[in-house]
Amino acid sequence: MAIVSSSSGRKSPCRETALVDPQPAPEEQVIRPEDSLRPKRLSEYIGQSELKQVLGIAVEAALGRGEALDHVLLYGPPGLGKTTMALVLAEELGVNCRITSAPALERPRDIVGLLVNLQPRDLLFIDEIHRLSRVAEELLYPAMEDRRLDLTVGKGSTARTRTLDLPPFTLVGATTRAGSLSSPLRDRFGLIQRLEFYGQTDLEAIVARTAELVSVDLTFDACARIAASCRGTPRIANRLLRRVRDVASVRQGKGTIDDAMVAEALSLHRVDHRGLDASDRRLLAMLMDQHGGGPVGLETLAAALGEDPVTLETVVEPFLLQQGLLVRTPRGRMVTDAARSHIAEAA
């Protein structure tokens, strides 16, 4: 299976990545099949049992008919394995996987170039698909539905339409904001699946697997503590494990990493036993201390914290909501009794 990555080559603004930020750090955005921690097959993919069952049946049916897999939309919070699942699907289908992201498809020729170079039954993965431009979306409509490209050649009175036939292919789109997709684009996906936060048992299995792959020896309690502190997100679990490994190699050298060493490493990075970092606790503490627990509007909250409202809503809040530490009301955000207890314990 070939993996081809496409990007615009434009540098994004530099920002500090929090240890428990589910967005990928720069070094995590590079896909290296030879040293990747990603599973290769559905049987190796831990968690998301319903998703695996649905996609496994679809893959087996497509292979049995000798057809391309239907188009797939994967959505959910960042860091849960959407890109990994796309690579797994390509491996299961035995086809090439071409990887790009919506911001890289700025001009019509960018997406046209990708589509015309696809081989039969290839898989095209578009990350952040909700950020596609209107022109790119309109090019995808006939490509997804009728396997053709409708191109306009020339301008004004000399303009004419040229149609190019495309081979059967599978588009896998990934997004953290499924509601931002236009209805015409969303309706062209035959399989629409949500990835959920991972449970403790699955996360422990992921941490144990990663530890084995990177030759780190963990006690069961150490593995459990990392799993409990990763916000239900495999990407964060692997990142925490790397930071624990760093601290352990300096503090004790080689040897088994125990629960106490993990606790020391997480404390050093200001990550508590529930996966909250200093920014999360500051948000909850500000709501309680300055606003009596809320409600507080998103814009006000973002301004007080110096955060972008979209980042706050899509990256920070989902985990706090899932943990029952924060609630959204028509009047704004409010802390819960569980949040008050947690902040009191951390004080």
Curated annotation (Swiss-Prot):
CDD domains reported for this sequence: AAA
Residues that, per the record, bind ATP: 37-38, 79, 82-84, 188, 198, 235
Alphabetized GO MF terms: ATP binding; ATP hydrolysis activity; four-way junction DNA binding; four-way junction helicase activity
Region Disordered: start-end pairs: 1-29
Binding site for Mg(2+): 83
SUPFAM superfamilies xrefs: P-loop containing nucleoside triphosphate hydrolases, Winged helix' DNA-binding domain
Binding residues annotated for DNA, in chain numbering: 328, 333
SMART domains: AAA
InterPro entries reported for this sequence: AAA+_ATPase, AAA_lid_4, DNA_helicase_Holl-junc_RuvB, P-loop_NTPase, RuvB-like_N, RuvB_C, WH-like_DNA-bd_sf, WH_DNA-bd_sf
Keywords: ATP-binding, Cytoplasm, DNA damage, DNA recombination, DNA repair, DNA-binding, Hydrolase, Nucleotide-binding
Compartment(s): Cytoplasm
Region (Small ATPAse domain (RuvB-S)): 199-270
UniProt xrefs under Pfam families: AAA_lid_4, RuvB_C, RuvB_N
Disulphide linkage map: none
Top-rank taxon: Bacteria
Catalyzed chemical reaction(s): ATP + H2O = ADP + phosphate + H(+)
Predominant subcellular localization, coarse grouping: cytoplasm
Region Head domain (RuvB-H), annotated ranges: 273-347
Segments for region (Large ATPase domain (RuvB-L)): 13-198
EC number of this enzyme: 3.6.4.-
Gene3D superfamilies xref list: 1.10.8.60, P-loop containing nucleotide triphosphate hydrolases (3.40.50.300), Winged helix-like DNA-binding domain superfamily/Winged helix DNA-binding domain (1.10.10.10)
Family: Belongs to the RuvB family.
Quaternary assembly: Homohexamer. Forms an RuvA(8)-RuvB(12)-Holliday junction (HJ) complex. HJ DNA is sandwiched between 2 RuvA tetramers; dsDNA enters through RuvA and exits via RuvB. An RuvB hexamer assembles on each DNA strand where it exits the tetramer. Each RuvB hexamer is contacted by two RuvA subunits (via domain III) on 2 adjacent RuvB subunits; this complex drives branch migration. In the full resolvosome a probable DNA-RuvA(4)-RuvB(12)-RuvC(2) complex forms which resolves the HJ.
Domain notes: Has 3 domains, the large (RuvB-L) and small ATPase (RuvB-S) domains and the C-terminal head (RuvB-H) domain. The head domain binds DNA, while the ATPase domains jointly bind ATP, ADP or are empty depending on the state of the subunit in the translocation cycle. During a single DNA translocation step the structure of each domain remains the same, but their relative positions change.
Annotated function: The RuvA-RuvB-RuvC complex processes Holliday junction (HJ) DNA during genetic recombination and DNA repair, while the RuvA-RuvB complex plays an important role in the rescue of blocked DNA replication forks via replication fork reversal (RFR). RuvA specifically binds to HJ cruciform DNA, conferring on it an open structure. The RuvB hexamer acts as an ATP-dependent pump, pulling dsDNA into and through the RuvAB complex. RuvB forms 2 homohexamers on either side of HJ DNA bound by 1 or 2 RuvA tetramers; 4 subunits per hexamer contact DNA at a time.
Protein name listed in UniProt: Holliday junction branch migration complex subunit RuvB
